[in-house]
Amino acid sequence: MSEMAELSELYEESSDLQMDVMPGEGDLPQMEVGSGSRELSLRPSRNGAQPQLEEEGPMEEEEAQPMAAPEGKRSLASGPNAGEQPGQVAGADFESEDEGEEFDDWEDDYDYPEEEQLSGAGYRVSAALEEADKMFLRTREPALDGGFQMHYEKTPFDQLAFIEELFSLMVVNRLTEELGCDEIIDRE
């Protein structure tokens, strides 16, 4: 538990350090955001002092020196040391892999709803209900239009005929999809 206390102290210290430096007040030159290059812009300081011309492009020293790993430290590409397994974490403070698992236990106990396995009959029933719901949503607007015509324009509207037609379309469409009759109907 002392490791957690040390980590939280380090986090608080780094947060405090970040809060101490406000943008524009540090000694670092301002760069154009999103320019994609390392060109520094000519900007006045916040205090109203004369703008300073900053250098442009990467430093020549950076270009000349290749990136090299510090001597005495191992890189990850060098492979495991003798006696160390390829998957092991090499660290002085990390005693065992079991310590980190206590935080992951809640994932094993949680049941994700999208991972539920439905039985064949239950899946078919839910699929039929979803299809009926989609059909209802698609036909709601014409039904409202039909009701509007019935009440306001005094045109004859047979609600029973409309319901029969709607239900037959739902059933016929569903059966043709399930039985694969789409090709047969299209050929005729």
From Swiss-Prot:
Role description: Interacts with RB1 and EP300 and acts as a repressor of MYOD1 transactivation. Inhibits EP300 and CBP histone acetyltransferase activity. May be involved in coupling cell cycle exit to the transcriptional activation of genes required for cellular differentiation. May act as a candidate coinhibitory factor for NR0B2 that can be directly linked to transcription inhibitory mechanisms.
Recorded superkingdom: Eukaryota
Subunit structure: Interacts via its LXCXE motif with the entire pocket region of RB1. Interacts with EP300, NR0B2 and TRIM27.
GO molecular function: transcription corepressor activity
Source species of the chain: Pongo abelii
Gene Ontology CC entries for this record: cytoplasm; nucleoplasm
Keywords carried by this UniProt record: Cell cycle, Cytoplasm, Differentiation, Nucleus, Repressor, Transcription, Transcription regulation
PANTHER family, A to Z: EP300-INTERACTING INHIBITOR OF DIFFERENTIATION 1, EP300-INTERACTING INHIBITOR OF DIFFERENTIATION 2-RELATED
Record-given protein name: EP300-interacting inhibitor of differentiation 1
Compartment annotation: Nucleus; Cytoplasm
Chain positions of motif LXCXE motif: 179-183
InterPro entries: EID (IPR033258)
Region of interest (Disordered), ranges: 1-122
Region (Interaction with NR0B2): 55-121
GO biological process: cell differentiation
Note, other: Inhibition of MYOD1 may be partly due to the ability of EID1 to bind and inhibit EP300 histone acetyltransferase activity.
